[in-house]
């Protein structure tokens, strides 16, 4: 029974995440997106998201070491390493897609 409950929860999480992604994609502009994110996230969550995105851009530039990024941003080397792993190794490709879109 607990396996069925856990499977249902995982499905619900995946469905809710997909609905959130679609909602974000459907917002008309950056200002509306920012308003939605401010309502949706705590200040700490928003700070973490914006820090990760900043780190992704710095890593993509390839000019700074993890320690230099840490010194410049205050973001932990653990977080920097996690962003680097998702940027370079994980199959999702979200960071890469967003960075490419910035360059286009």
Spans of features found by a protein language model:
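Long, charge-dense
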Residues: 73-76, 101-103
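General nucleic-acid-binding
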Residues: 1-27
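DNA major-groove recognition helix of helix-turn-helix
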Residues: 84-87, 91
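A general alpha-helix detector
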Residues: 16-20, 36, 54
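Short alpha-helical "recognition helix" segments of helix-turn-helix
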Residues: 67-73, 80
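Short, Lys/Arg-enriched anionic-surface-contact patches
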Residues: 33-52
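Short, amphipathic alpha-helical "recognition" segments used to contact nucleic acids or chromatin
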Residues: 49-63
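Short Lys/Arg-enriched helix C-cap and helix-to-coil transition segments
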Residues: 91-104
């Amino acid at each position: 029974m607990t396996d069925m409950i856990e499977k249902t929860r995982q499905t619900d999480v995946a469905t809710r995440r997909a609905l959130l992604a679609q909602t974000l994609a459907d917002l008309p502009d950056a200002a509306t997106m920012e308003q939605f994110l401010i309502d949706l996230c705590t200040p700490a969550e928003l700070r973490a998201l914006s820090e990760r995105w900043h780190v992704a851009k710095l890593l993509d530039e390839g000019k700074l070491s993890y320690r230099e990024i840490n010194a410049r941003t205050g973001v932990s080397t653990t977080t920097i390493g996690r962003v680097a792993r998702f940027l370079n190794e994980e199959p999702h490709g979200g960071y890469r897609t967003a960075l490419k879109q910035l360059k286009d």
